């Protein structure tokens, strides 16, 4: 209630399956939020405090964040027991992607057994941006995020880790190796705008040198062969 007017948003769906018209009615609002189990879930898992310079900012998830995160977590639970393919979490610009990732990471800790979350980007500035946002919400996440400083640092953070951890890295810190960094199944990899991490699974042969090379996606998957990816 202390937010500026532009931060007031509508709750446009009752069940996440249908977005109401431009202006919602009261039925959509009340049935979308105030079902007892959902209301308790929102209070418990979808309100966080972000530590800003001006003080703690209280953040409530928007309707699209709530329903999308819930669906992503359910897909993650299935993926960790299956092929590791969670899917794509799509956002429009300015719709709160970073905070959706925070809510997702928070909820995963209750739904999976001590998961390690690896956040991969393609640029240092984006890596810093996401790391900063997660660090502001570390009380909500119940752990302190870690930013890998180098390839060797990434190896030391992942190799031998048995549980927990939110680790930030760029994809350039992964490298070809005969040994995986971890064989655990409860590792979840979030790639954000890291498009090169989505392709490059096949081997390529350099016709001049005869050298065989693999793409970034293959390198990452080889490093964490039993992880699940979103």
List each model region and its residues:
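Conserved catalytic network of the ASCE P-loop NTPase/AAA+ motor domain
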Residues: 110-112, 159-161, 180-183, 221-225
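ATP-dependent helicase/translocase motor core
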Residues: 1-116, 125-141, 162-166, 186, ...
